[in-house]
Amino acid sequence: IGSDEEVMRYSPQKIRLVNGIGSVRISPLRRQLFKNFKCKGYQFENVIHPSAIIANEVILSEGVQIMAGVIIQAGCQIEVNTIINTGSLVDHDCLIGQHVHIAPGVVLSGGVVVDENVHIGTGAVIIQGLRVGANSLVAAGAVVIQNILSDATVAGIPARELYRN
C-alpha cells in the first residue's frame, strides 16, 4: 500500500490492517508498528490460513496470524499481534502473549505460557507446563525442559541460557 503516511490517508473506520512485518529474532519494529497504528484508532485483522486447524475453544486476540499447517488445540489463548508460523503445534491450554513470533515447526506441549515479545526459533520444542519469560529468544532446534527467565537467550538440547539482556 505504501508508507505509513499513505495508510493514514484512510480513515480507521474504513479499513482494517494486516501487519506484514515478520521477525527473525526479537525486534521492536513489528510491535512498534502495531502500537503506533492502534494509537491512531486502526484495527488489525486476523489472518488464518485455510489449512490451519484451530479448536473451537481457542481465543484469538486482534492481529493474530496463523500460517499453513498450524494446529492449535482447545483451551489456548493467543494475544495480540502474534504470529504462529507454518506447521507449528500448540497443544491444549497454552497462553501465548502479545507480540510473539513462533517460527515454523515449533512444538508447544500442553499448558505452556509464553510471555510477551518472545521469539521461538524454527523447530524448537517446549515441554508441558513451562513458562518462557518476556523478551526471550529460544534458538532454532532448542529443546526446553525448564522455565526460561525474562530477557534470556537459550539454545541447545537441552536448552541452556547463553546470556540475559
Predicted segments with their positions:
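Structural signal for interior beta-strand "rungs" in well-ordered beta-sheet cores
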Residues: N46-L162
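Short glycine-/acidic-enriched loop or helix-start segments at secondary-structure transitions
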Residues: P28-R30, I148, R164
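Terminal amphipathic alpha-helical/low-complexity segments used for targeting or macromolecular assembly
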Residues: I1-V47, A159
